[in-house]
């Protein structure tokens, strides 16, 4: 890892800005080879998000993870160690959805990152499958979310965490979030369980049966479930069109 990048990650984690997987456990190293750690520089300062490799040259993440400079780490387990499996690639282009709405009305919260160089496939780095544009994930589906960061309000971790979450009915989130949109968002996490994804886990994938169906978008300020995820299936035409258009522009 470049010394400056490692120092920035160390400072970020000292400030506890990395977010939360609540009620989960440590993932087996490299069991989620599509996971990406994003270090983002913006006028507001340094922040982190999750993301996931969808092709050797593209990472998908949340639209609100935008910044003037983004560094991507692939193949990581402990984000504060210089692991031999890690690949560090800068972002050539960050393409946020043209209809993205910032908080408080978060809509179309999705962004493609074109990498400056292609990722090398290995046991620790592999793309995840994307859904068919016509196939909708159903309530009751048991899915996995992974991310780095806090595991409770005050306790942090540097290693990748994972949690299994169940897709809820749209009404469950419509009752809690004023701007929930069932066409472009998924309601995830049983309100009766203390399991959720939160804050800096933003941009990470909801993976159901080995297919990325959602992107961590937002939730309640307390971190209690359910949380709202961007529905990838609704954006497949835009994703395919954008990757096709940019592939010839290296």
Curated annotation (Swiss-Prot):
Keyword annotations from UniProtKB, A to Z: Antibiotic, Antimicrobial, Cell membrane, Chemotaxis, Cytoplasm, Disulfide bond, Glycoprotein, Hydrolase, Lysosome, Membrane, Nucleus, Protease, Secreted, Serine protease, Signal, Zymogen
GO cellular component: cytoplasmic stress granule; cytosol; extracellular space; lysosome; membrane; nucleus; plasma membrane; secretory granule
Topological relation to the membrane, as annotated: Peripheral membrane protein
Species, as recorded: Rattus norvegicus
Coiled coil: none
KW Glycoprotein (keyword) present: yes
InterPro entries linked to this entry: Peptidase_S1_PA, Peptidase_S1_PA_chymotrypsin, Peptidase_S1A, Trypsin_dom, TRYPSIN_HIS, TRYPSIN_SER
Cysteine disulfide partners in this protein: 49-65, 143-208, 173-187
Protein family membership: Belongs to the peptidase S1 family.
Pfam family membership, one: Trypsin
Reactions it catalyzes: Specificity similar to chymotrypsin C
UniProt GO BP: biofilm matrix disassembly; defense response to fungus; defense response to Gram-negative bacterium; defense response to Gram-positive bacterium; monocyte chemotaxis; negative regulation of T cell activation; neutrophil activation; neutrophil-mediated killing of gram-positive bacterium
Protein name per Swiss-Prot or TrEMBL: Cathepsin G
Main localization of the protein described in the UniProt heading: membrane
Leader sequence segment: 1-18
Positions annotated as active site in the UniProt record: 64, 109, 202
PROSITE patterns: TRYPSIN_DOM, TRYPSIN_HIS, TRYPSIN_SER
Tagged with keyword Nucleus: yes
Gene field: Ctsg
Glycosylation, residue list: 71
């Amino acid at each position: 890892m470049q010394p400056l990048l490692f120092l920035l990650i160390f400072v970020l984690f000292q400030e506890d800005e990395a977010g939360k997987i609540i009620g989960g456990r440590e993932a087996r190293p490299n069991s989620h080879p599509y996971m990406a750690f994003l270090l983002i520089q913006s006028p507001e300062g340094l922040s982190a998000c999750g993301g996931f490799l969808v092709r050797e040259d593209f990472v998908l993440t949340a639209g609100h993870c935008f910044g003037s400079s983004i560094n991507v780490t692939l193949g990581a387990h402990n984000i504060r160690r210089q692991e031999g499996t890690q690949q560090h690639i800068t972002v050539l282009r960050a393409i946020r959805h043209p209809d993205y709405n910032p908080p408080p009305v978060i809509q179309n919260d999705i962004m493609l990152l074109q990498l400056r160089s292609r990722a090398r496939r290995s046991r620790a780095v592999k793309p995840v499958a994307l859904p068919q544009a016509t196939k909708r994930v159903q309530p009751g589906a048991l899915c996995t979310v992974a991310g780095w960061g806090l595991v409770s309000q005050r306790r942090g971790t540097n290693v990748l965490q994972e949690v299994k979450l169940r897709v809820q009915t749209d009404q469950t989130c419509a009752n809690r979030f004023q701007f929930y949109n069932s066409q472009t968002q998924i309601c995830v996490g049983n309100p009766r369980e203390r399991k959720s994804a939160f804050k800096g886990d933003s941009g990470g994938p909801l993976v159901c049966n080995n297919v990325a169906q959602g992107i961590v978008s937002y939730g309640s300020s307390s971190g209690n479930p359910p949380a709202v995820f961007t529905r990838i299936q609704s954006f497949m035409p835009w994703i395919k069109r954008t990757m096709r258009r940019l592939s010839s522009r290296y």
